């Protein structure tokens, strides 16, 4: 699913980081969600998605309205206009 989205080297590095049994840390995934969920509502809303790149680097650009809406549509499985943790996992 990430092939073509992430560089092969990045995918390999991520997989190598959790190759050993019991090395996957689900808390890291929760931290990722919490970082993007700036208002700690338990959901990632449109404005938080717009600033998604800036969670990685303060100098990064904001996503365009079209990019933000496409991102939201891809992750909003129940059509409520926001992405919950369960929806993110299912996306």
From Swiss-Prot:
Gene3D superfamilies reported in the protein's UniProt record: EF-hand (1.10.238.10)
Function: In muscle, parvalbumin is thought to be involved in relaxation after contraction. It binds two calcium ions.
One Gene Ontology term, aspect cellular component: cytoplasm
Residues binding Ca(2+) 2: 76, 78, 80
Biological classification of the source: Eukaryota, Metazoa, Chordata, Craniata, Vertebrata
Organism from which the protein derives: Merluccius gayi
Keyword Repeat included in the entry's annotation: yes
Pfam families xrefs: EF-hand_7 (PF13499)
PROSITE patterns, sorted: EF_HAND_1, EF_HAND_2
Record keywords, A-Z: Acetylation, Allergen, Calcium, Metal-binding, Muscle protein, Repeat
UniProt-recorded Gene Ontology molecular function terms: calcium ion binding
Name this polypeptide is given: Parvalbumin beta 4
Residues that, per the record, bind Ca(2+) 1: 37, 39, 41, 43, 45, 48
